[in-house]
Amino acid sequence: MIRVLSPFPDWLDLGGRTARPTQSDADILRARQQMVSEQLQVSARGITDPQVLKAMEKVPRHEFTPENVRAEAYDDTALSIGHGQTISQPFIVAFMTAQLQPQPEDRVLEIGTGSGYQAAVLAELVREVCTIEIVNPLAERARADLQRLGYNNVRVLSGDGH
């Protein structure tokens, strides 16, 4: 089955608590776990799919952010990744992923790779992800980051997904 992931309305309430990691691996891991427990699982936000929560906890969001905003990587906010683009806030990524209801045998097409973070989350849940980014430098950086992090089931294409 092929599923297409698309954005949702910008009117959704995106308020939430934040967790600022330091540079130590242990602190970053704690910040990622806190992101899941405090921003995504709280009843008002309603992310309940255990597989989605596990994927969000596993994927190192800080590895998909520029160095100058890395300390904010686990805040529930969009962050600039250059070229006028942003990495979506964690709640948005979790919400879209949960709405997709991914299955292990799925092949997913993502239009708008950005940093590659959403593709990495999806890659934890499905057989294959093909993602297309129109901004070539972002596609190249996402491809390199995904490969470096071992996401071999993600194919990054540079081009217009329209």
Where are the regions a protein language model picked out?
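Conserved nucleotide-cofactor-binding alpha/beta core module
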Residues: 101-162
